[in-house]
Amino acid sequence: MQPNESVSLSGAVAVVTGGGRGIGQAIATRLAAMDATVILTGRDEARVQQVARDMEGRGHRAEGIGCDVTDLASVEALGEHLRKTYGRVDILVNNAGIGGPSALLHELVPDDWDAIFRTNLRGVYYMIRSVVPLMIAAGTGHIINISSLAGKNPLPRGAAYSASKWGLNGLSYGVAEELRGQNIRVSVICPGSVDTDFSPRRGGKDTRKMLKPDDVANAVVMLVTQEPQSFISEVLLRPTQKP
């Protein structure tokens, strides 16, 4: 199935966490090109603001906001800004995440374990908690969680990361059932290794064969352009050739 970029998202408001680089930037850029108003968030406020300015320079509507998804007060402030400034959120892409160190589980320090779960799981909960009331009020919305194939298959020396993504998948399926009656769709994308600085298993792989950020952005476009009577709950995204 090919992404249908001929569909206009004019009037739609999209929020992309971790939107300052890599996968998040690719997703934000693609949604803006489809005429959505895009709010990019990230801990590096200067970076997301610069990316937003670059998008505005190309004639798109964008705003960059500093937000740490692991900080409840920061996320609640973002939610209040969205409510006052835009009055709605049609698309939420929970992309912010961390990989953590490559380590056997019994060697992983508790602080690293906590950091992985704060970002990859609790941060998604905070964002959903903040944005869903706006979607319910509007009677529509689409939440897209960026997970990983590591949430389907064990990742040696990355058990904590795998566990966080298994948790994110479970959260996605559960919230999808909770919100179906509210006309809110919830999808999860599980990509394999993507050629970004983030990739926890990038070293030693043939990056030419890895997925690119635009591949994940294509999957997001495919999801948000589905006809309203259906939705795709899960996308498993693999490279054609094994890196």
Specify the residue positions occupied by each region the protein language model found:
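Conserved glycine-rich cofactor-binding loop
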Residues: 13, 20-21
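Conserved glycine-rich Rossmann-like NAD(P)H-binding loop of the short-chain dehydrogenase/reductase
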Residues: 34-51
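The beta1-alpha1 cofactor-binding region of Rossmann-like NAD(H)/NADP(H)-dependent oxidoreductases
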Residues: 45-46, 66-78, 110
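Substrate-binding pocket helix/loop in short-chain dehydrogenase/reductase
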Residues: 103-105, 112-114
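Active-site helix of classical SDR
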Residues: 128, 164
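Residue(s) in the substrate-gating loop at a strand-loop-helix junction
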Residues: 148
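C-terminal helical subdomain
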Residues: 181-184, 188-189, 196, 205-243
